[in-house]
Amino acid sequence: MFCIQCEQTIRTPAGNGCSYSQGMCGKLAATSDLQDLLIYMLQGVSVYAVKAREQGIIDAEIDSFVPKAFFSTLTNVNFDDERIMAYAQQAAKYRTQLKASYEAACEQAGIVAEQVPQVAQLVLGTSKVEMLAQAPIALLNKDKHNVHEDIMGLRLLCLYGLKGAAAYMEHARVLGQTDADVAGRFHEIMSFLGEPSVDGDKLFTTAMDIGQLNYRIMAMLDAGETQAFGHPEPTVVNTKSVKGKAILVSGHDMKDLELILEQTVGKGINVFTHGEMLPALAYPAFKKYPHLVGNYGSAWQNQQQEFANFPGAVVMTSNCIIDPNVGSYSDRIFTRSIVGWPGVVHIEGDDFSAVIDKALVLEGFIYDEIPHTITIGFARNALMAAAPAVVENVKSGAIKHFFLVGGCDGDKADRSYFTELAKSTPKDSLILTLGCGKYKFNKLEFGDINGIPRLLDVGQCNDAYSAIQLAIALAEVFECNINELPLSLVLSWFEQKAIVVLLTLLSLGVKNMRTGPTPPAFLTANLAKILEEKFGLRNTTTVEADLKTMLNVA
């Protein structure tokens, strides 16, 4: 086992990364090894997808499968060995299919089929024992003694960034948004990473390419969500419990929420969002469901307590899931799509009757709590609608600075930095937030500036796209570039979606960002120095010191 993809990975003087019997996330060594083998098989599929494209062969089904299966290897997504093995076996079938199509096309064209690298040649074992025996060939640091640590760090930066992009591709696909050119570029990068490179410049360029690719993917996802559900609008949301039977929907998948809402109409069941599903309450399409009553709980790391206390059924539509046995709710939590946990019921297809039946036999909330409301829904259209008022307030001096504070949440104590930062921002500044990092401060009162709320909840982590659009619009109005705006970006990271959002911002030329609370363990000190020199990217320090720098206070 070797896994170093998330913020909570083991860090020791002897080396970084989870490499024992179990990762810090609870992932067993066998699960980690099977995930590595799955990635290896997917890279082999991409090798042939690239070759097939050269002969004019595009398979949309395979284009969708590879990022979806890749998504299953993200932090806190799939811990079910059987499901991971099934993905690997399907990858082997697709690779064989593409190989045959490619070779047939070459024969028809009168050309010789090209040799493929080792990553596209592995004959996958048929049992778990055989697959685990093959896993060393796919170990991410298998050649660590032969390559410089900076090269290893760049490889992992690319791999983990592409994982994040794959997740957004799958979210977009569910909403009907696919793009053959995007899929083709994705396969090219997967294929490249399947042949471990020692070219630092090429790897760095690839990391930026992944960022550019993800910008296109975020635009696709934005289009998918807004076309399906309308543009989010400022919305007041209750965060307390409501009497009645209950279902809690966590993850990121708006389509699953819609299916659950449709199937619970008239059933006497209240539906709550959780975590990154909170932004759903701002979409017009969901407001026709009076039984979508609010948001329950906070970010992913608190779920073992929050789900244990929730008196209904829980659905995990995507990341992040952690051990449901700790809170003794494994019999009433359901996984969906790429999510998996051994022994937990997995919902296939679009029928959520098992979830509904479970909710109906559970007690539900026995009384209404006194409501506590927050305001959400400041995504792209709402931000653009507010832009003229924002510009006038900037010109008048009422608004002097913008902060984007968001990203992933986590359970480390030093993440209190983000709470204190938000609380310490000047009263003449606006705070944009997104991702589950918002839960560090989104229930606090920040007031407004001439009717403009000081705290603007942009949405999910992928809604960084909306914040980028606002920054571009403001830069155009003030005839400057983004880096000349009075704008400070402070990103909390935990896993691979945050990594690819960071790469996206860097690829767009955004500079002087801060990330925290700790730097990725796979980034060497030398790589961190290069990123600081090239982009001004640095780690958070103290709220007082960082604010002075961001506000240019001597």
Curated annotation (Swiss-Prot):
The highest taxon in the source lineage is Bacteria
GO CC terms of this entry = cytoplasm
> Which Gene Ontology molecular-function terms are recorded?
2 iron, 2 sulfur cluster binding; hydroxylamine reductase activity; metal ion binding; peroxidase activity
Q: Which keywords does the record carry?
A: 2Fe-2S, Cytoplasm, Iron, Iron-sulfur, Metal-binding, Oxidoreductase
Q: What is its main location?
A: cytoplasm
Q: Which PANTHER family match?
A: HYDROXYLAMINE REDUCTASE
Q: Which NCBIfam families match?
A: hybrid_clust, PRK05290.1
Output this protein's name.
Hydroxylamine reductase
Organism of derivation = Shewanella baltica (strain OS155 / ATCC BAA-1091)
UniProt lists the gene as: hcp
